[in-house]
Regions:
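Short Gly/Pro-enriched turn/cap motifs at secondary-structure boundaries
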Residues: 41-42, 74-75, 149
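C-terminal motif of bacterial Sec signal peptides marking the signal peptidase cleavage site
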Residues: 9-12
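Active-site microenvironments of metalloenzymes and redox enzymes
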Residues: 15, 62, 83-234
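N-terminal pre-domain segments of enzymes
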Residues: 16-46
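Mature N-terminal segment immediately following signal peptide/propeptide cleavage
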Residues: 43-63
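Short, polar loop/linker segments at the starts of domains and inter-domain junctions
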Residues: 62-80
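Extracytoplasmic
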Residues: 48, 55, 75, 80-82
Length: 234
């Protein structure tokens, strides 16, 4: 037990006083300027409803003998980076949550924002079929709330991803005790990941992180991307 305890103490001390391999200066030392490095970072957390897909490489093109010698499908190795994917399709209830949130925040001052986000329900109409009930009820009726949302354009999908990134990161900061919930957000006084990182949004602060930079004169600071707390953009 004593041996294990000694190893833990030595390990923690070595991490605490780890130095830069290119300058020799200690990390996380306010006496040396306070350059902070997340030494105990393991891996990125998986966002709500996502699953991790490990990347790899595969051969694209001809994989068998070219009998006719056409050489019109030359094989090449393609590398795919690791990425995250939703466990299921985005449901109607998920998109309705998005519509509700942006209407609550921007509906009075910028109603065009809410209108621009509405999916095209007319995609159900077909000359050879009677799909009018889907046009009228598919998006909003509770019977279809767990069905995949349809009629969403590429631009709308990107806006949805930005909104989802902001909501996930805001909840992370609240769960970490850094921010408090603010139900009165409206217009430009709304949490946005990019705005928060560049100092254009503060929110209702609860307890910020310890600041190791003596030049600022502040004991606490906001979260930075280098801290590994916030998730990258969806």
């Amino acid at each position: 037990i004593l041996f294990i305890g000694s190893l833990l103490i030595i390990s923690s001390c070595s991490k605490k006083h780890e130095r830069s391999s290119i300058t020799g200066w200690e990390y996380n030392n306010p006496k040396n300027g306070g350059f902070e490095v997340k030494l105990d970072y393991k891996e990125q957390a998986t966002g709500p409803g996502l699953m991790f897909i490990e990347g790899g490489a595969f051969t694209m093109g001809r994989t068998e003998q070219d009998v006719f010698a056409d050489w019109n499908n030359v094989p090449k190795t393609v590398t795919v980076s690791s990425f995250y994917l939703d466990e299921t399709e985005v449901r109607n209830v998920d998109y309705l949550e998005y519509l509700y949130c942006i209407n609550r925040v921007y509906g009075q001052s910028y109603p065009e924002v809410s209108k621009k986000a509405l999916p095209d329900t007319l995609v159900w109409r077909d000359k050879l079929g009677y799909n009018e009930p889907y046009v009228l009820y598919y998006l909003r009726h509770p019977a279809y709330q767990n069905y995949p949302v349809v009629g969403v354009s590429w631009a709308q999908a990107n806006d949805y991803c930005i909104w989802r990134t902001d909501r996930v990161n805001e909840r992370i900061l609240i769960n970490e005790g850094i921010l408090k919930e603010d139900p009165e957000q409206i217009d430009d006084n709304t949490f946005n990941t990019e705005a928060y990182l560049v100092g254009q949004y503060d929110g209702i602060e609860r307890r910020l992180l310890k600041n190791l930079n003596p030049a600022t004169g502040e004991k606490r600071r906001k979260v930075r991307m280098e801290d590994g707390i916030l998730l990258p953009r969806y």
